[in-house]
Amino acid sequence: MSLYAPIAAIATAPGRGGIGVVRISGPDLAELAQRLFGRPLTPRHAHYLPFRAADGEVIDEGLAIYFRAPHSYTGEDVLELQGHGGPAVLRRILARCLQAGHDLGLRPAEPGEFTRRAFLNERLDLAQAEAVADLIDASSEAAARGAMTSLSGEFSQRVNDLSDRIIHLRMLVEATLDFPEEEIDFLEKYQARPTLQALTHDLDTLIAQARQGVILREGLHVVLAGKPNVGKSSLLNALAGDDIAIVTPIAGTTRDKVVQEIHIDGVPLHIVDTAGLRDTDDAVESIGIERTWKEIERADLILHLQDVTQPPDHLDAQIVRRLPARTPVLNVFNKVDLLDAAFQGQPDSLAISARGGIGLDALRQRLLQLAGWNPGAESPWLARERHLHALQQAAQHLEIATEHAREDDRVLDLFAEELRLAHEALTGITGKFTSDDLLGEIFSSFCIGK
């Protein structure tokens, strides 16, 4: 598969729509445009033309726009045909393009190949390319704004600034090592240690913001757990604002998980209603309970729901003992509307009524708090787990470098090496030094046509 052969794909989502787009990218597409339309196209102008089959039959009418390299999304020549959004029409237009460009090497594009070419042609860095996919996948306005901030290059600029400062600091270390006869301590002369402290501080700030970006992009896996009939399904419905789960007075109604995505202040939360936890001889219910524990094991946050009208028993104690210690647990006492007196709850617990709506706003805010979301923070860009991991790796190397900076000149070579490793971790975010395997993994997750 040649990276330089022209490629084509339907760029709009599958299904019917008012407009559909066929996108082509590659070298010298002026020749292909001449074959398709029998005339040259003026770059960056919209031409209203018939789209014809090889025998002259009119398939559709629409706009043809030619972008000459390097002034295009991919950095190559790009030809976009905008017609009506019917699947059959778009398939015929694409087939005609592939037929007309067969001897030019035109082939169907692979997922993400247009954006990969934009990256390889330095129209986007890797973090910006990922932001394209995140913008398409954004499930809330906050996530869309964050993706657009990343696409604009703000996150990349912050990373590049840190990288440049690390390079400058490394130059001072190398100069001290390479010119010992000068008897000049470049680290002292150019205040390298305060520079390293400032670098570490700014990197820590960036890590905190990246955590916000990861939460905004990926959300949290929140599991509702507890005995049967404590109101888990009612709480899911209340948070979702819809009747998602079946609610009955019969214990054991929920036998398999029910997942619903909700948004609180733009943050996506994947709420999982599960089978009630109890001892049972019912084979089907037992399978549901086993699945509940699997969901609990992979949860980011557990809401342990309890019925405030019922005293705790041995089963409650068993559940508490089995909950994973590494996962935050919020004890939620439901059905407070059925109490005659005010409820005296435990510290760090919440009292609610899922059906009556009591305490739900407080619960939503507690969920954000436990997620680590800071609503007063600077409007974040979206980040991925790999970005956060790379930033944390860079911070670890700077921490080790700081230790070496406190020693004598005999460890300056180690100081320089830790700075090199920190720089390498950061440049992996923007793709300056990134393996082909990682690139393949990232771009394969894109939709075809993007």
From Swiss-Prot:
Pinpoint the TrmE-type G domain residues: 219-372
User: Which family would the database say this protein is a member of?
Assistant: Belongs to the TRAFAC class TrmE-Era-EngA-EngB-Septin-like GTPase superfamily. TrmE GTPase family.
Q: What does this protein do?
A: Exhibits a very high intrinsic GTPase hydrolysis rate. Involved in the addition of a carboxymethylaminomethyl (cmnm) group at the wobble position (U34) of certain tRNAs, forming tRNA-cmnm(5)s(2)U34.
Q: What is its EC number?
A: 3.6.-.-
Q: What class of enzyme is it?
A: hydrolase
* Taxonomic lineage: Bacteria, Pseudomonadati, Pseudomonadota, Betaproteobacteria, Burkholderiales
MF (Gene Ontology): GTP binding; GTPase activity; metal ion binding
Q: Where do the annotations place GTP binding?
A: 229-234, 248-254, 273-276, 353-355
Q: Which cofactor does it need?
A: K(+)
Query: Which GO biological process annotations does it have?
Result: tRNA methylation; tRNA wobble uridine modification
Q: What is this protein called?
A: tRNA modification GTPase MnmE
Q: Which positions does UniProt annotate for Mg(2+) binding?
A: 233, 254
Q: Where does (6S)-5-formyl-5,6,7,8-tetrahydrofolate bind?
A: 23, 80, 123, 450
UniProt-annotated binding residues for K(+): 229, 248, 250, 253
Q: Name one GO cellular component term.
A: cytosol
What PANTHER family does the annotation carry?
TRNA MODIFICATION GTPASE GTPBP3, TRNA MODIFICATION GTPASE GTPBP3, MITOCHONDRIAL
Disulfide-linked positions: none
**Domain of life per record:** Bacteria
Q: Which organism is it from?
A: Bordetella bronchiseptica (strain ATCC BAA-588 / NCTC 13252 / RB50) (Alcaligenes bronchisepticus)
Oligomeric and partner information: Homodimer. Heterotetramer of two MnmE and two MnmG subunits.
Q: Where in the cell is it found?
A: Cytoplasm
Q: How is the cofactor bound?
A: Binds 1 potassium ion per subunit.
Query: What keywords appear on the UniProt entry?
Result: Cytoplasm, GTP-binding, Hydrolase, Magnesium, Metal-binding, Nucleotide-binding, Potassium, tRNA processing
